[in-house]
A protein has these predicted regions:
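Positively charged n-region of N-terminal signal peptides that target proteins for export
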Residues: 1-5
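Conserved small/polar residues in nucleotide/adenosyl-binding loops
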Residues: 18-24
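An exposed tryptophan-centered "aromatic clamp" motif
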Residues: 123-139, 145-199
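Extracellular adhesion/carbohydrate-recognition regions
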Residues: 28-138, 177, 207-224
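Sec-dependent N-terminal signal peptides
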Residues: 6-14
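Carbohydrate-recognition loop of C-type lectin domains
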Residues: 200-207
Length: 224
């Protein structure tokens, strides 16, 4: 699927650069109470219930998997892309701290991915590919360990939704379930980052030059 031709509205929406009134969301009114796990994020920025999506002619790009209830967060929640990214390395060589937080509890995949992309000492194939998904820079990002834990909790429900919109379900088979997080390993940041198992919810420190799949996410914001 060629994403670059139709995802500018999502970029504008998710980066809060959208200056005119918020787009018509039908089910999603711009308020936290109207956002539900399993809602469909469309290529034009609309967020629909599954029933509304099936009645539309819109194209799905992501499924809402987490709603943020904390007043301390700057977004309403997260949505996961309906396809895997191909296996790529976290870094194209070892020996460089790429500047991620290394936190196992922070919801900071967006910041981590930018650090990977913006590092002048080593290239990050997964960060570069994630940026290439979108027309004008960052919108999608590689989730942190914490954000992947949210996805793990609802993985079966999200897989049903992904299948309904024609996407590729998250692989839960033991040999194919590992996804890169955007989190480096504390004390070994020069050489290792965390893989997350969508089958068991465990994490495994892994050399950063090894290719593995990833599943980009987006944050959901509103201008209201």
């Amino acid at each position: 699927m060629k994403l670059k031709r139709f995802l500018l509205p999502i970029l504008a929406w998710s980066c809060l650069l959208y200056t005119s009134p918020s787009p018509r969301h039908e089910e999603f009114t711009g308020h936290l109470s109207s956002l539900q796990v399993g809602n469909v994020v469309c290529s034009d920025g609309n967020i629909l219930s599954m029933d509304k999506f099936k009645q539309s002619d819109k194209e799905a790009v992501a499924i809402v998997f987490h709603i943020n209830r904390s007043a301390e967060t700057d977004n309403l929640g997260y949505a996961v892309y309906i396809h895997d990214m191909e296996p790529l390395a976290f870094a194209d060589s070892l020996g460089i701290d790429q500047g991620t937080s290394a936190s196992l509890t922070d919801e900071d995949g967006n910041e981590n991915t930018y650090s990977l992309f913006n590092n002048d000492e080593v290239k990050s194939p997964i960060a570069i590919r994630t940026f290439d998904l979108w027309s004008y820079g960052q919108s999608a990002y590689i989730p942190s360990v914490r954000q992947l834990s949210f996805l793990f909790t609802v993985r079966h429900q999200i897989n049903e939704c992904i299948t309904e919109v024609g996407g590729t379900p998250i692989n839960l088979n033991p040999s194919e379930c590992w996804l890169w997080s955007s989190t480096e390993v504390e004390g070994q940041k020069e050489n290792k980052a965390w893989l997350y198992s969508m089958q068991s919810g465990t994490i495994q420190e892994t050399p950063k030059d090894q290719p593995h799949k990833s599943r980009p996410v987006i944050s959901i914001y509103t201008t209201k």
